[in-house]
């Protein structure tokens, strides 16, 4: 009788659970994974080279398009690298706004992860629940930047503008009654800060709903417990960061270990796992949402009592006011030169990283003294996590590969760059 051999299966890049354009070549013995070989590059856009071809202040938008679920956190690392090279002092109010939106972004990312991860393993309802809250936070993005995704809100020296005094409201439509419209606009009568304050007050109830749906659900536990186990020591060797590292029991978080912005002035805890499996990583991310909610609450309280500037007064990076440009030729020239030629950084190199929702997102920037970088290297957390796919999937069933892709929380915008 002929010997039965392993067979090869192409998973993706059109698979709905591939989270973008992942192509996995799976070597399978029956239904057990013997080898998983990720093929990347299908979303490569040459971002690093594009950033090197434009003035520093024209490349902020490229950062949003890396991990397109965690937009403002990407911007923060790039902006901090430029500010460190320029030696600019950022106003405290701008720092608090940045931290608040970093944490809003973290919740946005984790809600997207929770909804899609649940959908991947068969929990349909959680997707709808997660997007209910996500919509409110996307509205906060829209209120400050005009964009629901690619905000380009952070600028070297501060932020684009202060928080608006009026929250945008839903308009009358033939699809909704006056009563429905009134209910939808109930918490939008005040400022953006009032809206966020209302959100952080109600959000713990939403997290409890997610908990009730999933945490003790026996099918959810059967699909996640003991799947994709990575020990603490092995996680460090593989270069894991963020929830992937903390899920293995390592309490490493840049917000605590290497504080930036105003994180050292805020109170929050770092959740860690025990066994390093997919279920532990789920619990870590759930607790991270609670901690982010607590941080946002502290930021809102501080911002409500401390008005002030949100942009540095350094004319090298700060554009003139729109009203000044209407009647002052020098202001018009200043604006034109700033947004066409940008500014030059002194020669040198810098690495700045932030605690991104997926891990350590870093920017390594080399300047040769020109108005555009000589070299930019983007350290994407998902790249190291995907590299461990073979190790995490080996010995598991084919259906568990979907769980492992979900627990890694990979987005190909940052991996392929």
Curated annotation (Swiss-Prot):
**Membrane topology classification:** Peripheral membrane protein
Q: Which Gene3D superfamilies match?
A: Cytochrome-c3 Hydrogenase, chain B
Catalysed reaction(s) here are: a quinone + NADH + 5 H(+)(in) = a quinol + NAD(+) + 4 H(+)(out)
PROSITE patterns (alphabetical): COMPLEX1_49K
Q: State its Enzyme Commission number(s).
A: 7.1.1.-
Q: Which SUPFAM superfamilies does UniProt cross-reference here?
A: HydB/Nqo4-like
InterPro entries per the UniProt record, alphabetical: NADH_Q_OxRdtase_suD (IPR001135), NADH_UbQ_OxRdtase_49kDa_CS (IPR014029), NDH1_su_D/H (IPR022885), NiFe-Hase_large (IPR029014)
What is the superkingdom listed in this entry's lineage? Bacteria
Please give one Pfam family short name.
Answer: Complex1_49kDa
User: What do the Gene Ontology cellular component annotations say?
Assistant: plasma membrane
Where does this one sit in the cell? Cell inner membrane
Q: Write the record's keywords in alphabetical order, separated by commas.
A: Cell inner membrane, Cell membrane, Membrane, NAD, Quinone, Translocase, Transport, Ubiquinone
- GO molecular function annotations of the record: NAD binding; NADH:ubiquinone reductase (non-electrogenic) activity; quinone binding
Which EC main class describes this enzyme? translocase
- Similarity remark: Belongs to the complex I 49 kDa subunit family.
Supply the NCBIfam families for this chain: NuoD (TIGR01962), PRK06075.1 (NF004739)
Q: Which PANTHER family match?
A: NADH DEHYDROGENASE [UBIQUINONE] IRON-SULFUR PROTEIN 2, MITOCHONDRIAL, NADH-UBIQUINONE OXIDOREDUCTASE 49 KDA SUBUNIT
Describe its assembly.
NDH-1 is composed of 14 different subunits. Subunits NuoB, C, D, E, F, and G constitute the peripheral sector of the complex.
Q: What does this protein do?
A: NDH-1 shuttles electrons from NADH, via FMN and iron-sulfur (Fe-S) centers, to quinones in the respiratory chain. The immediate electron acceptor for the enzyme in this species is believed to be ubiquinone. Couples the redox reaction to proton translocation (for every two electrons transferred, four hydrogen ions are translocated across the cytoplasmic membrane), and thus conserves the redox energy in a proton gradient.
Name-wise, this protein is NADH-quinone oxidoreductase subunit D
> Which species is listed as the source?
Ruthia magnifica subsp. Calyptogena magnifica
What is the gene called? nuoD
């Amino acid at each position: 009788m002929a010997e039965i051999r392993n067979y090869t299966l192409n998973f993706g890049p059109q698979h709905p659970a591939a989270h973008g354009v992942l192509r996995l070549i799976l070597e399978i013995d029956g239904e057990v994974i013997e080898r998983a070989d990720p093929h990347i590059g299908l979303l490569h856009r040459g971002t690093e080279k594009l950033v090197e071809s434009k003035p520093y202040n024209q490349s902020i938008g490229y950062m949003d398009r890396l991990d397109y679920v965690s937009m403002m956190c990407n911007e923060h690392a790039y902006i901090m690298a430029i500010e460190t090279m320029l030696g600019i002092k950022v106003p405290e109010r701008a720092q608090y706004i940045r931290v608040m939106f970093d944490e809003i972004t973290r919740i946005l990312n984790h809600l997207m992860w929770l909804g899609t991860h649940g959908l991947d393993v068969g929990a349909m309802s959680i997707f709808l629940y997660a997007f209910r809250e996500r919509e409110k936070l996307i509205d906060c993005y829209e209120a400050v930047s005009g964009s629901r995704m690619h905000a380009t809100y952070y600028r070297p020296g501060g932020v684009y503008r202060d928080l608006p005094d009026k929250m945008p409201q839903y308009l009358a439509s033939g699809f909704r009654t006056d009563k429905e419209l009134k209910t939808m606009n109930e918490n939008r009568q005040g400022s953006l800060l009032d809206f966020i304050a209302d959100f952080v007050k109600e959000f713990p109830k939403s997290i409890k709903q997610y908990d009730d749906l999933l945490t003790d659900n026996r099918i959810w536990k059967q699909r996640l417990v003991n799947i994709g186990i990575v020990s603490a020591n092995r996680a460090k060797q593989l270069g894991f960061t963020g929830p992937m590292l903390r899920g293995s029991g390592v309490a490493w978080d840049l917000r605590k270990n290497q504080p930036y912005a105003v994180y050292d002035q805020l109170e929050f805890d770092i959740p860690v796992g025990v066994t390093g499996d997919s279920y532990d990583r789920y619990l870590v991310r759930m607790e991270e949402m609670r901690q982010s909610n607590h941080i946002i609450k502290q930021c809102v309280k501080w911002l409500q009592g401390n008005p002030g500037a949100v942009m540095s007064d350094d004319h090298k990076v700060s554009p003139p006011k729109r009203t000044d440009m209407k009647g002052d030729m020098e202001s018009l020239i200043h604006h034109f030169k700033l947004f066409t030629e940008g500014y030059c950084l002194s020669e040198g190199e810098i690495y700045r990283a932030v605690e991104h929702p997926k891990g350590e997102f870093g920017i390594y920037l080399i300047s040769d003294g020109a108005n555009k970088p000589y070299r930019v290297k983007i350290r994407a957390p998902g790249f190291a996590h995907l590299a461990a796919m073979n190790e995490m999937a080996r010995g598991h069933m084919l259906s568990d590969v979907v769980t492992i892709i979900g627990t890694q929380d990979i987005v190909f915008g940052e991996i392929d760059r």
